[in-house]
Amino acid sequence: MGDITWVEEGNGSATSSRKRKARPKRFEFVGWGSRQLIEFLHSLGKDTSEMISRYDVSDTIAKYISKEGLLDPSNKKKVVCDKRLVLLFGTRTIFRMKVYDLLEKHYKENQDDSDFDFLYEDEPQIICHSEKIAKRTSKVVKKPRGTFAAIVSDNIKLLYLRKSLVQELLKSPDTFEGKMLGSFVRIKSDPNDYLQKYPYQLVQVTGVKKEHGTDDFLLQVTNYVKDVSISVLSDDNFSQEECEDLHQRIKNGLLKKPTIVEMEEKAKKLHKDQTKHWLGREIELLKRLIDRANEKGWRRELSEYLDKRELLQNPDEQARLLREVPEVIGEELVQNPEVSSPEAHKSDNEQRLSESPLSCIHETPEARNLFGGEDQQFNNGYVMSNPITTPGITSCATEINKGLPTWIASAGAEYLHVDVEQPANGIIGGETPTEESKVSQLQSSIPVNNVDNGSQVQPNPSEVIELSDDDEDDNGDGETLDPKVEDVRVLSYDKEKLNWLYKDPQGLVQGPFSLTQLKAWSDAEYFTKQFRVWMTGESMESAVLLTDVLRLV
């Protein structure tokens, strides 16, 4: 019968001794510093009752290294550690310039779980059996991020493409468009755009097309009407001011706010190309710096440049950079107190009218033709100077009688003019009116048709309709209107509110924008005279000429 060998089941612990590079141990702290640091300072006669700064400890170690002659004869940047330094740093050699960084883990205030292996020398170390047991990992709870990505330089760099990189991407036409869409490029600002404060601006690529008759590509970008040639792109870094300008345009609604998921997916697609392009540029730059340091005799800078170039040319370092996963910074979760529903802005008077029988007034062609046909804005046949959501009722939002709004509703040839009641004491804004306003009751003989059931609705006799005392029969142009119709004054739209949408030449709906922005672009002749816009909450079919809207501004 053969021998039987019992094998212990694996439990996640190592069963044999081997050499490997280990992370630094978690230190035992005595007061403000680790036990190793405190003992080292005690051996030099230092008082550790109060915390000694890292700068002072680093200076003390530098003097100790010079005094003991611990610099490596073949490489003056390396230190051959003696017994004291081995106990302190846990390795036989260190870089002289890394002493300050190596001391960070020895301070209790800096204790964390981040990996600090890159500060240590690449040499195998013998570790004890207790270190070979698999360590339990604790879950680190990260700060929650918002849905949208922050518009900061670190995020924009992940999607920023220089001119030289775009030219490299052109060598693969099959993937060129997919990599360009959604990325950011830097172009010169339009000299005729007086709203642009900086000579260059960051724009997002929204489309790619071939130039007619050639194989060259043209880019369609935001905030720029014309197509952009690749030859005019910038090959330099963007500035912080340009990034802030991009952020402001996104806040104004000129660009779509990117989400974290969208930006992460796009950054992963571009990471490999960006890293290879950066490595080539950096190595070429170091070559020029090395030549310059040789000419000037800068020995210290020359040594640093040579080390950095050697590191970047190392295949392992290049592979590590390519494996890095770009991380997107999320927008801070800050509640915006200004965001509210449209119902919150509805006045009490408008709410009262929307619930009254006046909301059932019948549509008539006379109302459509009374004020100039196409030049006026209508909602189902009723005159509207500022569209609202209540069908059949028009909020002219006029400023009759010192800022009191007036609503006009039409039924056939009759018009009901409703004014907000004056205060009981007859004083508005601290002023006494010169003449008391006229008050009249609605005549019950005026029929008002109900659209729902066809029956005539008689106004409530108790309702009081206040007529403005300064209404005249003549309008501003000297033309006489129907005496039954009250004078309608149109209040300008809110110029700063983001209320307006339009359709661009590519067929995409853009907006919302404010009238201030639209007027600036119209003055710069970006739009034709037949350019149409419409308000949020309405359909594209209700679009009106921008020139007509701007007349009311």
UniProtKB/Swiss-Prot annotation:
Residues in GYF domain copies: 497-551
Q: Where is the Plus3 domain?
A: 150-275
Pfam families, alphabetized: GYF (PF02213), Plus-3 (PF03126), SWIB (PF02201)
Matching InterPro entries, A to Z?
At5g08430-like (IPR045894), GYF (IPR003169), GYF-like_dom_sf (IPR035445), Plus-3_dom (IPR004343), Plus3-like_sf (IPR036128), SWIB_MDM2_dom_sf (IPR036885), SWIB_MDM2_domain (IPR003121)
User: In which domain of life is the source organism classified?
Assistant: Eukaryota
Show the ranges annotated as biased composition (Acidic residues): 466-480
Q: Which residues form the SWIB/MDM2 domain?
A: 26-109
Which GO molecular function entries does the Swiss-Prot or TrEMBL record give? DNA binding
**What residue spans carry the Basic and acidic residues bias annotation?**
343-353
Polar residues: bias regions: 447-461
Region annotation (Disordered) maps to: 335-357, 447-482
In Swiss-Prot or TrEMBL terms, this protein is called Uncharacterized protein At5g08430
